Amino acid sequence: MLVLGIESSCDETGLALYDTGAGLLAHALHSQIAMHRDYGGVVPELASRDHIRRVLPLLEQVLADAGRTRQDIDAIAFTQGPGLAGALLVGASVANALGFALNVPMVGVHHLEGHLLSPLLTREPPPFPFVALLVSGGHTQLMEVRGIGDYALLGETLDDAAGEAFDKTAKLLGLGYPGGPEVSRLAEFGVPGAFELPRPMLHSGNLDFSFAGLKTAVLTQTRKLANTCEQDRANLARAFVDAIVDVLVAKSMAALRQTGHKRLVVAGGVGANRQLRERLDQLGRQRKLDVYYPDLAFCTDNGAMIAFAGAMRLQAAPELARREYGYGVTPRWDLADIRLPSAA
């Protein structure tokens, strides 16, 4: 089965072709970072218009790269939510039109399920069950994953996501957009322990997160350093990253203890952070745990994860293959609400 995946939930347009027999055949991505940089963040209207411009050329690109035609497509998977409503509608509209024209089934995919399953695209995918740490610009969650469509929420952020905290800290430090990678790069030059920042909810006794207080602590420090030198900024960035990593690692280890699982999957844009990976890998070796990550190319939003998640859902529950076109979008959507019929 050849599945076309379409991702358009925010500021990246991604398309991919995944074959259930041969694996990932092709993927293409257009990032809108340059367009949004002048605004310091994503402008929803501009994002939607750019998706419209990019989606069909990217479709032709992946077909050419895979040596396939539109008539070879057996099913279409698209990001149904969560995300920006206008951006989601672009992908959904293209999926509906193509599905109708080609008379092939389509399936709406939860954006976070795509991230959660993206490590399964690697050469050594994790077997079920496992704990997943989803850390991105808009979400920070710990999930227990028992199988395709069988997910249980263990904990989540009560305010800012880790990625949001990175972006807001970047602005406080006068860094560019997107903020997450800029903060991480600056932190490489920082001296550990030069600043003391809180580890919110580190000892809360549950698996929830909170990063708003950490952001406020960074703001307080920047105000004290009115004439901040570059080394001070690097030291503060290092303190911030260390605080984030400490909390993410501690909560992940607690989730593994609570569930009894020995496998941890880390996905989402923040999952590309070097310090986070090094800490988790070190603990994995010490505690005989297996830690899995997606390829770096698939940490951020992409069409490959949507094509793969759609293919897995259709294989697990063929009744999801519908030709009832006119699918809408779900800008707000809890991952735990998408159980397959067989997992209900």
Swiss-Prot record:
Coiled-coil regions listed: none
Location of the protein in the cell: Cytoplasm
InterPro entries: ATPase_NBD (IPR043129), Gcp-like_dom (IPR000905), KAE1/TsaD (IPR017861), TsaD (IPR022450)
Cofactor remark from the record: Binds 1 Fe(2+) ion per subunit.
Assigned EC number: 2.3.1.234
Residues binding Fe cation: 111, 115, 301
GO molecular function, a single term: iron ion binding
Keywords from the UniProt entry: Acyltransferase, Cytoplasm, Iron, Metal-binding, Transferase, tRNA processing
Gene3D superfamilies reported in the protein's UniProt record: 3.30.420.40
Signal peptide: none
Reactions accelerated catalytically: L-threonylcarbamoyladenylate + adenosine(37) in tRNA = N(6)-L-threonylcarbamoyladenosine(37) in tRNA + AMP + H(+)
Family in the record: Belongs to the KAE1 / TsaD family.
Role played: Required for the formation of a threonylcarbamoyl group on adenosine at position 37 (t(6)A37) in tRNAs that read codons beginning with adenine. Is involved in the transfer of the threonylcarbamoyl moiety of threonylcarbamoyl-AMP (TC-AMP) to the N6 group of A37, together with TsaE and TsaB. TsaD likely plays a direct catalytic role in this reaction.
NCBIfam families: gcp_kae1, T6A_TsaD_YgjD
Protein name: tRNA N6-adenosine threonylcarbamoyltransferase
Biological source species: Cupriavidus taiwanensis (strain DSM 17343 / BCRC 17206 / CCUG 44338 / CIP 107171 / LMG 19424 / R1)
